[in-house]
Regions:
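Transmembrane-helix signature of 12-pass secondary carriers
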Residues: 1-459
Length: 459
């Protein structure tokens, strides 16, 4: 029989001191993000396939667009399922879809079959990313939620230089025919380990259980967490400061995302993620091809790509240090302006040294923004009752731009060269910076429950 008393899981989670429990939740989510690098190897796989004669600019655009289309569907449907079934079940389900599609894709007999598998990879990955980034915010305290989320993004985005290093090591040892296949099998095996860890150690979100009115289950999970924290710290827990009104949770229908305060947040989140998708995935999927278009050979293009991609973890490390020190709106606007300016300067370079140096700093700022957008700001702006649905809808809308962008990049690269591509990226960045400045909300240091009360009350 369900208990009547509301467990106030949010306030109880927020009062917990940082300890090994937080670190274990962080480690599971971060490792899951680190090894799900099917998207990170996209550009490297395409470079190998181009050497094999499997692809040209048009096919590359299709490969990139179909990946984004899959991620669009995964993000859209994944949030609905995740809000219905819970964070833990969604985590495991989406990992299974992603792993299976990578294994099957690794044995593709031709490009058409690989593109079909790539779509399914995108579905699994799109749903998984929404679940991990948005769901993780429910486990962490509001006082340093941005820092914890940045740490997750920091570890997760080591996948880009890591898979580039693996590609560098594999290129002289394995033929191109087998190289790209191995690059898909490696993350599949590692993701299987992540799934096993989630199955064994990852609890359901007490906040989610409470939002569904499952008070007895929420209380059981919450007590288990609190008892573990007391054992780990050897100290009594601080008093609970109730942030909500104690009322029973309200159901938030999907239609609520299309009106009022929540619609404004959908528009805001979508804009933030449009900039992220267009800039990040253009660089991931096209940078090696851009280098080859400039006359740089395959080996050197992979080396340049690898050196540039080390800016990814460095950028997120910097973001981790400053995330809870700078207002969210200020940080988003500032990063987008820097990306627009530096991207244009980068497009004018011909020296290998300057390409490497400026490319490193460009990727640094891009991944500071990626951390800000995907791991912190967009996941923060939703009430628990609709967190995955809201985040997934914004992700889905944001990914529509990623479907069209590869074709625009292909045309611009062929007609106007590298500069044309980076003018497009700069224009998108400036438009979204204006959107954040005008309709953005401030979430730094604000509790999940405070955001929920405001949004649900005005839905």
């Amino acid at each position: 029989m369900e208990q009547i008393t509301k467990p106030h899981c949010g306030a109880r989670l927020d009062r917990l001191p940082d300890c090994r429990w937080h670190s274990s939740m962080f480690a599971i989510v971060a490792f899951g993000l680190l090894v799900c690098w099917s998207n990170a190897v996209g550009g490297l796989i395409l470079a190998q396939l181009k050497a094999l004669g499997w692809t040209d600019n048009s096919t590359t655009a299709t490969f990139s667009a179909i990946t984004t289309a899959g991620m669009f569907l995964g993000a859209l449907v994944g949030g609905i399922i995740g809000d219905k079934t819970g964070r833990r079940n969604a985590f495991i389900l989406y990992e299974a879809i992603h792993i299976a599609s990578m294994v099957v894709g690794a044995f593709s007999p031709n490009m058409d079959f690989l593109i079909a598998c790539r779509f399914v990879m995108g579905v699994g990955l799109g749903a998984l990313l929404v679940t991990l980034f948005a769901g993780f915010t429910e486990y962490m305290p509001g006082r340093n939620r941005g820092t914890w989320s940045s740490r997750v993004s920091f570890i997760g985005n080591w996948s880009y230089p890591l898979c580039s290093l693996i590609a560098m090591g594999l290129t002289p040892l394995i033929s191109a025919e087998w190289n790209w296949r191995v690059q898909l099998l490696i993350p599949a095996i590692l993701s299987l380990i992540a799934t096993a860890l989630a199955w064994r150690y990852f609890p359901e979100s007490p906040r989610w259980l409470e939002s569904r009115g499952r008070y007895q289950e929420a209380e059981k999970v919450m007590r288990s967490i609190e008892e573990g924290v007391i054992r780990q710290t050897g100290k009594p827990l601080p008093p609970v400061v109730i942030a909500d009104d104690g009322k029973a949770p309200q159901a938030v229908p999907y239609s609520a995302l299309l009106t009022g305060v929540l619609l404004k947040r959908v528009i805001l989140g979508s804009c933030v993620l449009i900039a992220m998708n267009v800039v990040q995935y253009t660089l991931i999927n096209w940078l090696p091809t851009i280098f080859m278009t400039q006359g740089i050979n395959l080996k050197d293009s992979i080396v340049l790509n690898t050196m540039s991609m080390f800016g990814a973890p460095f950028g997120i490390f910097i973001a981790m240090l400053v995330m809870d020190k700078i207002p969210r709106k200020t940080m988003g606007v500032g990063l987008l302006i820097l990306i627009a300016v530096l991207g244009y300067i980068y497009s004018l370079q011909t020296s290998m040294l300057l390409i490497t140096l400026i490319g490193f700093f460009l990727i640094t700022f891009v991944y500071m923004y990626v951390c800000y957008a995907s791991a912190v700001y967009v996941p923060e702006i939703w009430p628990t009752e609709a967190k995955l649905r809201g985040s997934s809808l914004a992700n889905a809308v944001g990914r529509i731009s990623g479907i069209a962008a590869p074709y625009a990049v292909a045309v611009l690269l062929s007609s106007y060269g590298v500069t044309g591509v980076f003018i497009l990226l700069g224009a998108v960045s400036i438009v979204v910076a204006i959107a954040i400045a005008t309709i953005g909300i401030e979430t730094k240091g604000v509790s999940v429950e405070s955001l929920s009360i405001d949004a649900v009350a005005n839905k």
